[in-house]
Amino acid sequence: MQIQFKIIPAESIDVVVPLVKKMSNPSITEPLLLKRFKEMVTQNYECIGVYDAEKLVGVSGLWFCTRHYSGRSVELDHVFIEDAYRNKGLGSKFVNWIQRYVKSKGYEAIELNAYIANEPSHKFYERDGFQKLGYHFVKEIG
């Protein structure tokens, strides 16, 4: 394995759609995901890829903001690593790389949301020092 972590340029954001589709709601189509990602890259958003040589095997979005309770923070979004690359320490290396990257940009905290049913991810994040602070609620208004 030749693992590298790289920022995915905005003009190449379409490469993440197949990976994110694997973890998203089945009713969200690939064309809709692509449309949303093309809009996201125009906001305070970056996307980091995990590459094995030239093959994209993992991804995480980063939303940059300032919050009253955590200061300058980055929210991890749609964190995903292909099944064949899991349970090999790659997730910890990825989060550590992200932490160093965002700290170098002057950010103070990392936050994320995890689906309630995704217990393995909860255990992973807790082992990595994340603390549960609350629930994330969504209400569609469209």
Where are these regions (language model features)?
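Conserved N-terminal entry element of GNAT/NAT acetyltransferase domains
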Residues: 1-11
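Glycine-rich phosphate/pyrophosphate-binding loop shared by adenosine-nucleotide-utilizing enzymes
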Residues: 3, 54-59, 74
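A short helix-loop-beta-strand connector motif used in the catalytic cores of GNAT acetyltransferases and
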Residues: 39-49, 75
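Conserved beta-strand in the GNAT
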Residues: 49, 55-64, 80
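A conserved beta-turn-beta hairpin within the catalytic core of GNAT-like acetyltransferases
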Residues: 65-76, 86, 132-133
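Conserved acetyl-CoA-binding loop-helix of GNAT-fold acetyltransferases
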Residues: 81, 87-100, 127
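Conserved active-site alpha-helix within GNAT-family acetyltransferase domains
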Residues: 92, 116-134, 139
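Conserved GNAT acetyl-CoA-binding A-motif
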Residues: 95, 102-114
